Amino acid sequence: MEFEITSDTRNELLGRRELRFILTYDGATPSRKEIRGKLCALNNINENLVVLDSLRTGYGRMQLDGFMRIYDTEEGRQRTERSYLLNRGEPKKEEEEA
Protein backbone atom coordinates (compact mmCIF):
# COMPACT_ATOMS: atom_id res chain seq x y z
CA MET A 1 0.00 0.00 0.00
CA GLU A 2 1.28 3.41 -0.96
CA PHE A 3 -0.31 6.67 0.16
CA GLU A 4 -0.14 10.02 -1.56
CA ILE A 5 -1.70 12.93 0.33
CA THR A 6 -3.24 15.31 -2.21
CA SER A 7 -4.73 17.86 0.20
CA ASP A 8 -4.09 18.65 3.86
CA THR A 9 -6.14 21.51 5.29
CA ARG A 10 -6.72 22.68 8.85
CA ASN A 11 -10.27 23.47 10.03
CA GLU A 12 -9.78 25.59 13.15
CA LEU A 13 -13.50 26.08 13.74
CA LEU A 14 -14.08 22.34 14.25
CA GLY A 15 -10.60 21.55 15.61
CA ARG A 16 -9.54 19.06 12.96
CA ARG A 17 -7.33 18.36 9.94
CA GLU A 18 -8.95 17.25 6.70
CA LEU A 19 -6.91 14.98 4.42
CA ARG A 20 -7.58 13.85 0.89
CA PHE A 21 -5.40 11.00 -0.29
CA ILE A 22 -4.81 8.47 -3.05
CA LEU A 23 -4.06 4.90 -2.02
CA THR A 24 -2.40 2.50 -4.46
CA TYR A 25 -2.66 -1.19 -3.55
CA ASP A 26 -2.13 -4.68 -4.96
CA GLY A 27 -4.77 -7.40 -4.87
CA ALA A 28 -8.09 -6.92 -3.10
CA THR A 29 -9.26 -3.55 -1.86
CA PRO A 30 -8.04 -3.06 1.74
CA SER A 31 -10.61 -2.76 4.53
CA ARG A 32 -11.39 0.52 6.27
CA LYS A 33 -9.68 -0.79 9.40
CA GLU A 34 -6.44 -1.55 7.49
CA ILE A 35 -6.48 1.85 5.79
CA ARG A 36 -7.12 3.72 9.04
CA GLY A 37 -4.38 1.77 10.83
CA LYS A 38 -1.82 2.42 8.10
CA LEU A 39 -2.64 6.15 7.86
CA CYS A 40 -2.47 6.53 11.65
CA ALA A 41 0.90 4.76 11.76
CA LEU A 42 2.30 6.96 8.98
CA ASN A 43 1.08 10.20 10.60
CA ASN A 44 1.78 9.02 14.18
CA ILE A 45 -1.77 9.67 15.44
CA ASN A 46 -4.21 7.87 17.72
CA GLU A 47 -6.86 5.82 15.84
CA ASN A 48 -9.59 7.15 18.16
CA LEU A 49 -9.16 10.64 16.70
CA VAL A 50 -9.63 9.60 13.05
CA VAL A 51 -12.77 9.28 10.90
CA LEU A 52 -12.66 7.86 7.37
CA ASP A 53 -15.44 9.62 5.51
CA SER A 54 -15.31 8.34 1.96
CA LEU A 55 -13.36 5.79 -0.06
CA ARG A 56 -13.97 5.65 -3.80
CA THR A 57 -12.53 3.02 -6.11
CA GLY A 58 -12.53 3.10 -9.88
CA TYR A 59 -13.33 0.17 -12.10
CA GLY A 60 -10.16 -1.63 -13.18
CA ARG A 61 -7.88 0.59 -11.10
CA MET A 62 -5.79 -0.61 -8.18
CA GLN A 63 -6.24 2.79 -6.61
CA LEU A 64 -8.76 4.56 -4.41
CA ASP A 65 -9.45 8.16 -3.50
CA GLY A 66 -10.21 8.85 0.15
CA PHE A 67 -11.14 11.58 2.58
CA MET A 68 -10.41 11.47 6.31
CA ARG A 69 -10.67 13.82 9.27
CA ILE A 70 -8.23 13.92 12.19
CA TYR A 71 -9.60 15.56 15.35
CA ASP A 72 -7.61 17.27 18.10
CA THR A 73 -9.69 15.66 20.87
CA GLU A 74 -11.96 12.65 21.34
CA GLU A 75 -14.75 14.96 22.60
CA GLY A 76 -14.61 17.03 19.42
CA ARG A 77 -14.89 13.89 17.33
CA GLN A 78 -17.89 12.60 19.30
CA ARG A 79 -19.62 16.00 19.23
CA THR A 80 -19.14 16.66 15.51
CA GLU A 81 -19.33 13.35 13.67
CA ARG A 82 -22.47 11.43 12.78
CA SER A 83 -22.86 8.17 14.70
CA TYR A 84 -22.91 5.92 11.64
CA LEU A 85 -19.53 7.27 10.54
CA LEU A 86 -18.07 6.53 13.97
CA ASN A 87 -19.31 2.93 13.79
CA ARG A 88 -18.46 2.30 10.14
CA GLY A 89 -15.83 -0.37 9.63
CA GLU A 90 -16.23 -1.81 13.13
CA PRO A 91 -17.44 -5.41 13.58
CA LYS A 92 -21.15 -5.73 14.28
CA LYS A 93 -22.12 -6.63 17.84
CA GLU A 94 -23.76 -10.02 18.22
CA GLU A 95 -27.25 -9.91 19.68
CA GLU A 96 -27.79 -12.04 22.74
CA GLU A 97 -30.20 -14.91 22.29
CA ALA A 98 -32.78 -15.26 25.08
From Swiss-Prot:
Matching Pfam families: Ribosomal_S24e
Biased composition, class Basic and acidic residues, residue ranges: 89-98
SUPFAM superfamilies xrefs: Ribosomal proteins S24e, L23 and L15e
Molecular function (Gene Ontology), one example: structural constituent of ribosome
Keyword 4Fe-4S: no
A GO CC annotation given for this chain: ribosome
InterPro entries: Nucleotide-bd_a/b_plait_sf (IPR012677), Ribosomal_eS24 (IPR001976), Ribosomal_uL23/eL15/eS24_sf (IPR012678)
Gene3D superfamilies: 3.30.70.330
GO biological-process terms attached to the record: translation
Keywords associated with the record: Ribonucleoprotein, Ribosomal protein
Residue span of region Disordered: 76-98
Keyword Ribosomal protein: yes
Family: Belongs to the eukaryotic ribosomal protein eS24 family.
Name used for this protein in its record: Small ribosomal subunit protein eS24
Species in which this protein is naturally found: Methanosphaerula palustris (strain ATCC BAA-1556 / DSM 19958 / E1-9c)
Name of encoding gene: rps24e
